């Protein structure tokens, strides 16, 4: 018997396992817990895009097409033809569909177009639900008729047939019968995972009622802290808030007892006498006490990339060392509770992951990498003659010196991601970014001179931002792209995030009112607020305009 089965639910990146479950698994195993893993996300996609399922969907689509002969039939028929090409390709070589991301230029890849059409046709019988594949980013997003931030909608979705409901049930059942765990832990990280996660829990509870089901992860810690819907607990036994390693280990130990004491497990939320109750907080595990992520939990050859192109996630520190940006959820403990490890220990963990997995691309997923720690890692990569490419998120920082950046480049740094947000001094100050335009110019110059490409992130529609200020920022960004100082720029419309300084004190940022969907009780972000400056409609229009203008530069 396995103690615990850890599940990564749909929908997240199909090109690699997310890091949360491997981190949990490594810690639990170091404490003597027997652990099994199920990446339900990739197993779903393998079933959803299998020749057998696509043939079924094609048949359903052709029936539906006859009903739509007078409304868009030409477009649908074009997609059906594309699906038939995909079916031919997959039938000839079943593995080919799961290696489509190996192209170095996905936007020009016919295979990517086939995948996009294949997803579109596979989703057609489930309209209005669908999965949207963005070729330029590789992300697959889930669009549902149900609201992901609403407890009542979650409960409704469980009772309905969805894109995933029939396909995941046999996968879950097979895994549980094989591993025979007494506890299942589901890692809920992204909003697109919410509805499938609760369906997963419902399947487990209906077929294996004696199994203890617990959920944790970034979404749970951010959006379900004050859960008031007791009915949710008919499908789960508990939630774990914030860092889950020590609480989950404690929970497994309690569940082995004849009379478990859930009240003794820290960071836990469970139902007691019909009401959700919270146990006391627990200090997170010191980063130096965490072992290397256990990617051996999953078979890496099941993802839609091969080892040569898989960018495996690796986290160095926890939280953000700046933790003051006004738009960020800085009141959540896993953001504000920053902790960084011994640099040499982290390098040894990195070396272990590379040796055990055989990957040659690493994505350091820290909110903001610490320049000194990255310097040590880069030095050791060179010293040990490790041949990898790596990317990382950085803040604009005076510690990004010419010498450090040249070292990063020599060690294999392939790209640097920078959250810039704005190039207007007033807006930067309101954001409390702790950076100036001079620092931005200085950093971009030395990064460019080192030969490392830059991906920058920008925001449109920050509270009180005017159209002139937004255009001023964009014009500067446009010039940087034109002069090849920035490789890529990603624009997004501003949203008010829960637990951020702006959400907690909106009046300080010129916000007069914030409109939230009354059905959404799980602290959703909001793009609907009233403030001086441009309207929300104008912000959206400008964002689309800027994206289009930058796309024309390719």
What positions do the PLM features span?
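Flexible glycine/acidic-rich beta-alpha junction loops that bind and position SAM and/or redox cofactors
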Residues: 37-49, 220-225, 374, 426, ...
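Canonical Radical SAM [4Fe-4S] cluster-binding loop centered on the CxxxCxxC motif
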Residues: 307-344
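Conserved SAM/AdoMet-binding glycine-rich loop
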Residues: 5-9, 210-214, 347-454, 460-462
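N-terminal [4Fe-4S]-dependent radical SAM core
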Residues: 152-156, 164, 271-313
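Short, electropositive alpha-helical surface patch
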Residues: 377-382, 387, 466-483
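Glycine-rich beta-alpha loop elements in corrinoid/cobalamin-binding modules
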Residues: 11-14, 18-54, 72, 127-131, ...
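Conserved Radical SAM active-site core
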Residues: 43-45, 50, 59-181, 206, ...
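Structural recognition of alpha->loop->beta junctions
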Residues: 227-250, 408-416, 472-496
